[in-house]
């Protein structure tokens, strides 16, 4: 037969690829009586190409979750003589989310969620770097210092800070340790090693005095000592600072809370540096 007679025709409406749903044979979409996906022999083998001019079908709806109906499943259960409701909920997300509203059909079914949040938060990482269910803190609110290292019990405010700290514990089972060529320190990831090597190479150099730093923001704060720029101003008084950390320490003097107390005398201080200076001066010298 000449090749000119071989004409491939396409459907005017896009049909869903029910063949992909065969992987859900053991999920909620299958019959609980015979474990067979009802109507699977009627499913098409391939999906027709999408034409933008075609009218939208229910399976093209993807605003949040669009559901596909399988009306063959209830009829299939009736032929088996099985009574009772069949739990059917499987979510389907189609390719044209912005063009159609969400459509929910009867007897639809929902896919299991891709992400299940833990019942308790915040978590504490165990020795293997995984979440330990029995070590999670009670409640769901994040409190300061709620992320604790299981190795040295050092508290952290965020999970990201705890993850960066645990790079120092090279005995974590990562399968490979990265050793610094300048010292004997080891790290669990290559990224942590590269950040550490910058403390040896000091690539950020001041063009005014030649002083070198490991981080760009450290160099930027140092340049302010040459220019005299103090962009961080206190909202309570007229004092300004070149570094944000100095402003945070200064704000403690306005709050009125002095949590650093001397162990010898009843004096208290708002900053740890002031307490250290007080102790070095000898608040209560002995005989």
UniProtKB/Swiss-Prot annotation:
Give GO terms for biological process.
negative regulation of transcription by RNA polymerase II; regulation of DNA-templated transcription; regulation of transcription by RNA polymerase II
Q: Tell me, what is one Gene Ontology molecular-function annotation carried by this entry? A: DNA-binding transcription factor activity
Q: Which residue numbers delimit the C2H2-type Zn fingers?
A: 147-169, 178-200, 204-226, 232-254, 260-282
Which region ranges are annotated with the description SNAG domain? 1-20
Q: Is the keyword Membrane assigned to this protein?
A: no
Q: Where in the cell is it found?
A: Nucleus
Q: Which cysteines are joined by disulfide bonds?
A: none
**Does the record's keyword annotation contain Ribosomal protein?**
no
Domain remarks: Binds E-box via C2H2-type zinc finger domain.
Q: What does this protein do?
A: Seems to inhibit myoblast differentiation. Transcriptional repressor of E-box-dependent transactivation of downstream myogenic bHLHs genes. Binds preferentially to the canonical E-box sequences 5'-CAGGTG-3' and 5'-CACCTG-3'.
Provide the family line: Belongs to the snail C2H2-type zinc-finger protein family.
PANTHER family, per database record: ZINC FINGER PROTEIN, ZINC FINGER PROTEIN SNAI3
Protein name, as recorded: Zinc finger protein SNAI3
Q: What is the originating organism of this protein?
A: Mus musculus (Mouse)
Organism classification: Eukaryota, Metazoa, Chordata, Craniata, Vertebrata
């Amino acid at each position: 037969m000449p090749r000119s007679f071989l004409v491939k025709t396409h459907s005017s409406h896009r049909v869903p690829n029910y063949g992909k749903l065969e992987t859900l044979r053991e999920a909620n979409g299958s019959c609980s009586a015979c474990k067979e996906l009802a109507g699977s022999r009627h499913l098409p083998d391939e999906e027709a190409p999408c034409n933008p001019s075609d009218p939208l079908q229910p399976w093209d709806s993807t605003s949040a979750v669009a559901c596909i109906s399988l009306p063959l499943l209830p009829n299939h259960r009736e032929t088996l003589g099985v009574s009772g409701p069949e739990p059917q909920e499987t979510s389907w997300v189609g390719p044209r989310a912005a063009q159609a509203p969400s459509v929910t059909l009867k007897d639809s079914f929902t896919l299991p969620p891709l992400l299940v949040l833990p019942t308790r938060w915040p978590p504490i990482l165990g020795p293997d770097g995984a979440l330990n269910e029995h070590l999670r803190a009670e409640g769901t609110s994040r409190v300061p210092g709620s992320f604790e290292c299981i190795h040295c019990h050092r508290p952290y405010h965020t999970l990201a800070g705890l993850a960066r700290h645990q790079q120092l514990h090279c005995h974590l089972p990562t399968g490979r340790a990265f050793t610094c060529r300048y010292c004997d320190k080891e790290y669990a990831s290559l990224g942590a090693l590269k950040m550490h090597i910058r403390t040896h190479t000091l690539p950020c150099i001041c063009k005014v005095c030649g002083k070198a730093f490991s981080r760009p923001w450290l160099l930027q704060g140092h340049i302010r000592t040459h220019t005299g720029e103090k962009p961080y101003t206190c909202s309570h008084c007229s004092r300004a600072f070149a570094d944000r950390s100095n402003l945070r320490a200064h704000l403690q003097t306005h709050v009125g809370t002095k949590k650093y107390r001397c162990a010898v005398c009843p004096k208290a201080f708002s900053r740890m540096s002031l307490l250290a200076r007080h102790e070095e001066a000898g608040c209560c010298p002995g005989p």
